[in-house]
Amino acid sequence: TLPIYAELVREIGGGEVEVSAIANPNEDAHFVRPKPSFARDIRSADAFVTTGLDLELWVPTLLDRAGNGDVIEGARGYITAYTGIALLDVPVSADRSGGDVHIYGNPHLTTDPLRTLQIARNITTGLKRVAPDRAAVFDAGLADFTERLYNRLFGARLVELIGGETLEQLSHGGTLFTFLEANEYEGNPLIKELGGWLARAEPFRGQDIICYHKNWAYFEDRFDVSCADYVEAKPGISPTPGHVAQLINRMKTENLDVMLAATYFDRGKVETVARRGEATLVQVPLSPGAREGIDDYFTLVETWVTELAAAFRNQ
C-alpha cells in the first residue's frame, strides 16, 4: 500500500522482488482514491503488504476488485505490518465524532525505527511464506537491514559493546537511558558510548512541541519528545478558527517554539499557524521519495532527527 513498505520489501528482497506502491510518497494514506490500475497491479501480485489496521480503509475495495485469492486477508500472500507491534493511542470508544479516530490504535507505525524493524521482520516472514525457496536471500536482507538500523539508532560502538537485540529490548521497555547511566565501561558511564540518532536527538529529548496531526506518536515514544497539542483538534478534520486562535495563544504563553508536520499537509496553512505562534516549522516527509535526496528509510529518519534537532538548537 505505502511507499515505505515498498522500500522495506526492496531492502529485504533485493533483486528477488519486483515491488510497487499504491500511494505516492507525498500522499496522505488516509485519502488514497482507488484506481482501476491499482486493482490490475494487485491481480498479478504474489504478495500484498498493508498496515492491517484502519489506515488504508480503501484496501478491501481494491482487493475485491482485483479478485486475487492469493493476497486476500488470511491468504499466504497477505502481509500485515502491525503484527507483533505494541500500539499506542488505542481509544476507549470508537466514536467518530472525535474525528479520524483509529479504532485499533495509531497506525502511523513507521515513525519509530524499532517498530519499523518489526515491520521488516513481518515482511520477511511473509515473503518466505510466498517464496520459501528464496528464504536465505530474505533472511540475509533482513539481517543486513537490522544491523544497519541498530548502528544508526544506537551508534555502532554501543551496539558492539551491548548488542543490538539487548538495546532494542531496553528501549522498548523504557529503561535504556537508566541502564546506560547506571552502568560503566572502563570507568566511564555507558551513556557516553551512545551514538546514532538517539545521541543526536539530545536537543529535543524531553521537550514539548506542537504537531499538526497525530502521526508522530511512535516517534515521540522512541525519541522522548512530546506533542503537547495539535493543529488538528480532531484528527483528519480541518481546525476551526477558534481552535487555531487558542492554540496560537498557548504556543506563545507556554513557549512552544517548534512545530512538526508532514509534507503532505498544505504548507501555506501550516506556515501560517507556525508564524502566528512564533514557532519554527519543521515540515518533513513521512515516506522515502517524497523529497529529493531521501531515497530510503535511513535518510528519512536522518532528516527527521537532523531538522528537529536544528530547530531546537536555533531557539
Can you say where each PLM-predicted feature lies in the sequence?
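Extracytoplasmic metal-acquisition and chelation regions
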Residues: 1-315
